[in-house]
Swiss-Prot record:
NADP(+) binds at residues 31-32, 58-59, 77, 82, 160. It comes from the Eukaryota. It holds the Pfam family Epimerase. It is an enzyme of class 1 (oxidoreductase). Keywords: NADP, Oxidoreductase. This is Epimerase family protein SDR39U1. It comes from Bos taurus (Bovine). The keyword Transit peptide does not apply. GO terms for molecular function: oxidoreductase activity. PANTHER family: EPIMERASE FAMILY PROTEIN SDR39U1, SUGAR NUCLEOTIDE EPIMERASE RELATED.
Amino acid sequence: MRVLVGGGTGFIGTALTQLLKARGHEVTLISRKPGPDRITWDDLTTSGLPRCDAAVNLAGENILNPLRRWNAAFQKEVLSSRLETTQTLARAIAKAPQPPQAWVLVTGVAYYQPSLTAEYDEDSPGGDFDFFSNLVTKWEAAARLPGDSTRQVVVRSGVVLGRGGGAIGHMLLPFRLGLGGPIGSGHQFFPWIHIRDLAGILAHALETSHVQGILNGVAPASSTTNAEFARALGTALGRPAFIPLPSAVVQAVFGRERAVMLLEGQKVVPRRTLAAGYRYSFPELGAALKEVIA
């Protein structure tokens, strides 16, 4: 299968590319700069979709970059990096004389409203209560294609855990020093997924002809709270993990609106993902963290 991957040079894209190639697929990346097995976004706009069997979009500016202030300019970047790349790919697919069989987009569980009690599956409502939920709604709308000639899948990802990137990269140093702990109250849910499983869900969606619609890209152990995650990471490292990061500090660093992504959370279950036949490599947090820090 020939797969076109937008945003394929990032953390998730690298893992997906490695997995697809290991399964015998050909991968072409869409990036800002040309290179071997790559095209640019400008190429896609001017020359149209290269012949491919499937397309994936992973492109998007890192929302939780602590070096960027949460102001109007950065919010515009966050929006445009997702919506414009998705619209560009969707338009190219719609215009292609031989459209791909599958079109997969990765968004986020920010679609679902934070709650200490609610449980969300793929059919749960959301997408209309704050900047981030509205972003997911617009993002997914930008990917929709007319007709049904191409199978369409959206994977709403949780916090991605893996070596060399993702959420763990920012956490390891304080936890290794014994200075880690829960964020804020620690009571908020922490929907997570191992990078190998997120790549696996994407590959499963590409390869399996009956998979379509929304899939939640989270581990089945979805009742994990932030405090439980902190304890599990401390245990995996053999270090204490009881020093909380105060809410006021998080809000000062990220801004009040963006801090919600860390201080509040959702209990999300992958009901349709499991029903679609995907088998998790890391369904439990302990084993996932052990692999990440090994």
